[in-house]
């Protein structure tokens, strides 16, 4: 399975000194030692990455290891724009995460933004053919890090 890692948990996933690292350590272990891959794309996500430069270097290393799948920025941006246009929920600021799920088919999001979770799982944002994602928010969800659920995008090297 691939995983979209919300930038709000980069420190927890990648920094062993983080107070919450043990909760997110299974994610990094699954990527390093299993078939897990990080999925990302879109202008907003890349801008958020730009604010987390020390983690950008880690992402580059994972890309060299074929552990990253980049989704077409234009497709993500277009879908994000549609979601934002149709959105009546003014509290939502993670349209880009939902757009990455839709464009990539990735079914797992790693986040600790509890206010975003209801929106990320909100069925009305997704086409009927798209499965709603599961949320990894801590060690209790490590059963979601299962190789048997690898999304098609993570089985190929090409960018969608």
Regions flagged by a language model, labelled:
Residues 114-160:
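Acidic, PIN/NYN-like endoribonuclease modules and their adjacent C-terminal/linker elements
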Residues 52-63, 119-128:
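Short, aromatic/basic amphipathic alpha-helical patches
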Residues 34, 66-69:
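Short glycine-centered helix-capping/turn motifs at secondary-structure transition points
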Residues 1-3, 108:
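The start of beta-strands in P-loop NTPase/AAA+ ATPase cores
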